[in-house]
């Protein structure tokens, strides 16, 4: 494939070069032609000549001479390079419409016949303007015969040479959008390598107290850029280091980029690291100082350095002189810390682009160039030869601080930092515990174990008043959150007050709009039951009149044979009858008179002359009504699923074959009855899953609320889970949770297999599984990184924090619930569990009692019409970690010993929100003595007294009787398979009656104990968990009184 040249970019840039030359400013004013020659030298990394070539053509062209005259451009190169340059030479009239001069191409020969080509170029120089002065890059000297002969030819003619390095650098310093994108990418790769490799490696070295040489660590950083996981999706062949990484510590510091990492061992003090990565010829730079146990003075100096960088960023604006930027920073040093004036670096940074360091754009006191929008600088500030007064060893006494970033000059406001690596003390400081502190802690622990509570109480008395325990800090923060919670809820309800709720239009079930549309069948005339399948109507004789009933009005039917007769009983829906969860209110006029049931009787005996028995009509009617009813309910269910579905944009397919793609994945929920494998591919605006049989599921990026990546650590599957903003339809159902997963290892274990701990097959299988896990994790991570790069990080995948996870039962089975940065999730079990933290109003812990091993967690949403979420059976050991996590997320939590009837509580709030907040709002959940209206605690007793001990039956009743439609989309209802038979209630069975008797006995025993302890409990000090009303009713899991307190 031929190498292509970006013609538009070439014409744009050569026009800019000529435009600046013709303006005649600075060195441009005196030159008649520009001569640029590039030879072959592997040791030269940065040169103006090669930078100009890369800027114009996108590539370096060795052994090439470029002569820019006033009215023409001449390129002399090898035959292959001339073919490449023909892409810009062969234009209409050999001159670009933008006014770029015509191009002449000369082929370089390998023998001495180049003289004629040299003469042509010399003649062109002489004809350009005055033909005496030529602009050259005086520092660029390339070896080789070709370069020497050309240099001799120029010297022979006696042209005056003017160094134009600075003015050309200023011309190409302003970056176009394409160049800025490359520099941003280079900066992001540098940040990735620093964060994910270097910083982590230094932490490991410090933690393990390893001895590692600076040079070895620098080499490992260079090797890291060969691994794709640190390159943010970039091709490794396009990435290289700008210079070998510079790592310094232990008193030997030189804050320049020309030094090399020495072979000394890393000292755990101030560790400076400078690294720069080049992406597609464009450079970036990053400098950070990692500090191990910094003293207060070191931290103060470091914070002052950050302050200076902020000042520098503010001054880097379009139109400001570079020397003014430098002077303003120096003024801050003189005013605030003049003793550091001789310690600061001589310059504060330099321009950067294709060349790492642009010598003419150094930020110092002498540079008169003005900054322009689109310029990119590497800003580097540091203090060297600082003295650590607390240092004892020679390497501890002297330290240096050095920070640097790649920044972009904007038109207004401070410069934009492209290397987004955090640099505050808390981010770069590594704080270790002293051995003495650790010994003291161990001694305290031992003392507690030996002496028990007496010693603990003695140690607690030593605490000063200013010290606060974690629990006290949490409580203080929770009080602040409680005040904010009620205020925000009031404001939110006030805003929503004016919003009208859209009432759903009821579907009309009129079979025939007028009598003429009724069918004229013999069955109807013969006063038999007839089913009109087309209009889904049952026509029955009522008082001798054929009366149509739509299938939607029929609740159920039953048929029975008694003696010589067959009975067909038809039950209808009517006001007052129990409706199923999915039926809703289907009566447009509930005040009308309704038929509740009709029973028909027919003889089983054949009359003389009749071919069939009369009961055959009832038998056929029973069968056909069942069929029509089933078809109608199935269709209604499908229509209900489609209700409220937001129409999605069409997926824009990316025809590029290098799209991020994952193969051999399963989808949940299944598209068909049987699970099928397929592939997930990222396109321009969304994902497409294609199964092996061709089914397609599209998920758009803008419809994804949470994108979760659940690694396979400790799990049997590896999952990509998408929680959607609006439901999507596939498999005839709507889904707000879609996930793609693959299994890791064997889900089942052969228990009959003979196992031995040293069995080679087992060891090999374990090794294979480990490798498979690693391979899958790498594949998924690469996919995620590519997708994030493709979407410009608009879509970010969250990884659950397994360390913060806790067990609970949000549905029927217990699973591990794990927080992410914005949600609480479980993606490995099905149905999945996802709660968005931004939508949560507060969390309430129920059944928190000393003698119970677990408790329940209730999640109340900001949308009060939404059903609360219950997580049952959470181990008590998880209570404090959950509180700590919720507190860190600024979420209000409360706790109590009782189980509350949340359906009634939420209905009370929705019916009268103003009254609810006037009575103190959510403070009724606070334990006695802590709520803001504790003294008026009895005023809310109406709500609090609605407590009960929930059993499975209670939860079912809540769901049935709820006025709100709380049905979750994750739940799969099987109402299409509901029995259509008689709904006669059956009596309670023996097990239920025995259970009720046991409960009655237990409650009577508790009431006796309660009477004895009530007088004592009033005298005790009120604590978080003491509640007179709930003490006997909440303790349904234990018959024994509490024996010990939980810490």
From Swiss-Prot:
Covalent link Glycyl lysine isopeptide (Lys-Gly) (interchain with G-Cter in SUMO2), residues: 497, 513, 647
Cellular component terms (Gene Ontology): FACT complex; nucleus
Stretches the record annotates as Disordered: 491-518, 918-1047
Disulfide bonds: none
Coiled coil segments of this chain: 465-507
Residues with the Phosphoserine modification: 188, 455, 508, 650, 658, 979, 982, 986, 1015
Positions where N-acetylalanine occurs in the chain: 2
Residues modified as N6-acetyllysine: 139, 196, 223, 513, 732, 786, 904
Ranges of Low complexity composition bias in the record: 1024-1039
Record field: compositional bias (Basic and acidic residues): 985-1005
Biased composition regions of type Polar residues, renumbered to the chain: 499-514
Tissue: Widely expressed. Expressed in brain, liver, heart, kidneys, lungs, spleen, thymus, ovary, and testes, with highest levels of expression observed in thymus.
UniProt cross-references to SUPFAM superfamilies, sorted A to Z: Creatinase/aminopeptidase
Chain intervals with Acidic residues compositional bias: 927-973
Top-level division of the source organism's lineage: Eukaryota
InterPro entries noted in UniProt: Creatin/AminoP/Spt16_N, Creatinase/aminopeptidase-like, FACT-SPT16_Nlobe, Fact-SPT16_PH, FACT_SPT16_C, FACT_SPT16_M, Pept_M24, PH-like_dom_sf
Stated role: Component of the FACT complex, a general chromatin factor that acts to reorganize nucleosomes. The FACT complex is involved in multiple processes that require DNA as a template such as mRNA elongation, DNA replication and DNA repair. During transcription elongation the FACT complex acts as a histone chaperone that both destabilizes and restores nucleosomal structure.
Assembly and interaction partners: Interacts with MYOG (via C-terminal region). Component of the FACT complex, a stable heterodimer of SSRP1 and SUPT16H. Also a component of a CK2-SPT16-SSRP1 complex which forms following UV irradiation, composed of SSRP1, SUPT16H, CSNK2A1, CSNK2A2 and CSNK2B. Interacts with NEK9. Binds to histone H2A-H2B. Identified in a centromere complex containing histones H2A, H2B and H4, and at least CENPA, CENPB, CENPC, CENPT, CENPN, HJURP, SUPT16H, SSRP1 and RSF1. Interacts with GTF2E2.
Record remark on domains: The C-terminal Glu-rich acidic region is essential for FACT activity.
Recorded family membership: Belongs to the peptidase M24 family. SPT16 subfamily.
Protein name: FACT complex subunit SPT16
Organism: Mus musculus (Mouse)
């Amino acid at each position: 494939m031929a190498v292509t040249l970006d013609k538009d970019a070439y014409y744009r840039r050569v026009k800019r070069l000529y435009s600046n030359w013709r303006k005649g400013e600075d060195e441009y004013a005196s030159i008649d032609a520009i001569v640029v020659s590039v030879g072959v030298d592997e040791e030269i990394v940065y040169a103006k000549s090669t930078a100009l070539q890369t800027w114009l053509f996108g590539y370096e062209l060795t052994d090439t001479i470029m002569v820019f005259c006033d009215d023409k451009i001449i390129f002399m190169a090898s035959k292959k390079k001339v073919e490449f340059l023909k892409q810009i030479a062969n234009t209409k009239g050999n001159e670009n419409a933008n006014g770029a001069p015509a191009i002449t191409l000369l082929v370089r020969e390998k023998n001495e016949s180049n003289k004629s080509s040299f003469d042509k170029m010399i003649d062109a120089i002489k004809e350009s303007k005055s033909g005496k002065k030529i602009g050259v890059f005086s520092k660029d000297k390339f070896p080789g015969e070709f370069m020497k002969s050309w240099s001799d030819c120029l010297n022979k003619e006696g042209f005056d040479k003017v160094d134009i390095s600075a003015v050309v650098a200023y011309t190409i310093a302003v970056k176009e959008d394409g160049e800025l994108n490359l520099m941003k990418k280079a900066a992001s790769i540098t940040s990735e390598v620093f964060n994910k490799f270097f910083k982590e490696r230094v932490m490991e070295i410090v933690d393990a107290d390893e001895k590692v040489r600076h040079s070895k660590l620098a080499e490992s950083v260079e090797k890291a850029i060969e691994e794709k996981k640190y390159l943010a999706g970039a091709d490794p062949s396009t990435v290289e280091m700008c210079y070998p990484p510079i790592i310094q510590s232990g008193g030997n510091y030189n804050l320049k980029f020309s030094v090399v990492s020495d072979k000394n061992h890393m000292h755990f003090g101030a560790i400076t690291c400078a690294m720069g990565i080049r992406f597609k010829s464009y450079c970036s730079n990053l400098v950070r100082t990692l500090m191990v146990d910094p003293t207060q003075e070191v931290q103060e100096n470091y914070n002052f350095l950050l302050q200076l960088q902020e000042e520098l960023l503010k001054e880097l604006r379009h139109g400001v002189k570079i020397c003014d930027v430098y002077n303003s920073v120096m003024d801050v040093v003189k005013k605030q810390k003049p003793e550091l004036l001789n310690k600061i670096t001589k310059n504060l940074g330099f321009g950067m682009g294709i060349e790492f360091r642009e010598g003419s754009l150094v930020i110092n006191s002498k540079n008169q160039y003005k900054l322009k929008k689109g310029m990119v600088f590497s800003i580097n500030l540091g203090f060297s030869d600082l003295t650590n007064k607390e240092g004892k060893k020679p390497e501890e006494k002297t330290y240096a601080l050095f920070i640097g970033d790649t920044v972009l000059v904007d038109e207004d406001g401070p410069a934009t930092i492209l290397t987004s690596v955090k640099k505050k003390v808390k981010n770069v400081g590594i704080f270790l515990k002293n051995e003495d502190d650790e010994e003291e802690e161990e001694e305290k622990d031992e003392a507690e174990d030996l002496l028990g509570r007496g010693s603990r109480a003695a140690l607690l008395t030593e605490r000063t008043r200013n010290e606060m325990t974690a629990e006290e800090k949490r409580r203080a923060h929770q009080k602040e959150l409680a005040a904010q919670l009620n205020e925000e809820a009031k404001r939110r309800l006030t805003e929503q007050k004016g919003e009208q709720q859209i009432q759903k239009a009821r579907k009309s079930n009129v079979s025939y709009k007028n009598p003429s549309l009724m069918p004229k069948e013999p069955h109807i005339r013969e006063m038999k039951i007839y089913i009109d399948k087309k209009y889904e109507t049952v026509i029955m004789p009522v008082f001798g009149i054929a009366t149509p009933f739509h299938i939607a009005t029929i609740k159920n039917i039953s048929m029975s044979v008694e003696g010589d007769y067959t009975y067909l009983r038809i039950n209808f829906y009517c006001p007052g009858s129990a409706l199923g969860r999915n039926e809703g209110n289907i009566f447009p006029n509930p005040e009308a008179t309704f038929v509740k049931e009709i029973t028909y009787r027919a003889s089983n005996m054949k009359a003389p002359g009749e071919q069939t028995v009369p009961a055959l009509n009832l038998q056929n009617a029973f069968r056909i009504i069942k069929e029509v009813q089933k078809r109608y309910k199935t269709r209604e269910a499908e229509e209900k699923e489609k209700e409220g579905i937001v129409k999605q944009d069409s997926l824009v397919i990316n025809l590029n074959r290098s799209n991020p793609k994952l193969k051999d994945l399963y989808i949940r929920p299944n598209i068909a009855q049987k699970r099928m494998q397929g592939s997930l591919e990222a396109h321009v605006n969304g994902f497409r899953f294609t199964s092996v049989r061709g089914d397609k599921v599209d998920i758009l990026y803008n419809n994804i609320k949470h994108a979760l990546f659940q690694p396979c650590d400790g799990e049997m599957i590896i999952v990509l889970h998408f929680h959607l903003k609006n439901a999507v339809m596939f498999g005839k159902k709507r889904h707000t949770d879609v996930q793609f997963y693959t299994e890791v290892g064997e889900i089942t274990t052969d228990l009959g297999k003979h196992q031995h701990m040293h069995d080679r097959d087992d060891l090999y299988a374990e090794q294979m599984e480990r490798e498979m896990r690693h391979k899958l994790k790498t594949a998924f991570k690469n996919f995620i990184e590519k997708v994030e790069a493709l979407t410009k990080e608009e879509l970010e995948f969250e990884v659950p924090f397994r360390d913060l996870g806790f067990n609970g039962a949000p549905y029927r089975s217990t699973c591990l619930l794990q927080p992410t940065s914005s949600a609480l999730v479980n993606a490995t079990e099905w149905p999945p569990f996802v709660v968005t933290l931004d939508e949560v109003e507060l969390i309430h812990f129920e059944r928190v009692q000393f003698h119970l091993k677990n408790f329940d967690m209730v999640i109340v949403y900001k949308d009060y019409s939404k059903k609360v979420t219950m997580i049952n059976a959470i181990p008590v050991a998880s209570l404090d970690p959950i509180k700590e996590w919720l507190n860190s997320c600024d979420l209000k939590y409360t706790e109590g010993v009782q189980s509350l009837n949340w359906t009634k509580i939420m209905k009370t709030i929705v019916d009268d929100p103003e009254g609810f907040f006037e009575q103190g709002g959510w403070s009724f959940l606070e334990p006695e003595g802590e709520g803001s209206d504790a003294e008026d605690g009895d005023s809310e007793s109406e709500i609090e007294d609605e407590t009960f001990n929930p059993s499975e039956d209670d939860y079912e009743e809540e769901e049935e009787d709820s006025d709100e439609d709380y049905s979750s989309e994750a739940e799969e209802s099987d109402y299409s398979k509901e029995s259509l038979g008689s709904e006669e209630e059956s009596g309670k069975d023996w097990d239920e009656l025995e259970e009720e008797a046991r409960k009655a006995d237990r409650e009577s025993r508790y009431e006796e104990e309660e009477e004895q302890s009530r007088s004592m409990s009033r005298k005790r000090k009120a604590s978080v968990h003491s509640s007179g009303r709930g003490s006997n009713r909440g303790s349904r899991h234990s018959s024994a009184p509490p024996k010990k307190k939980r810490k």
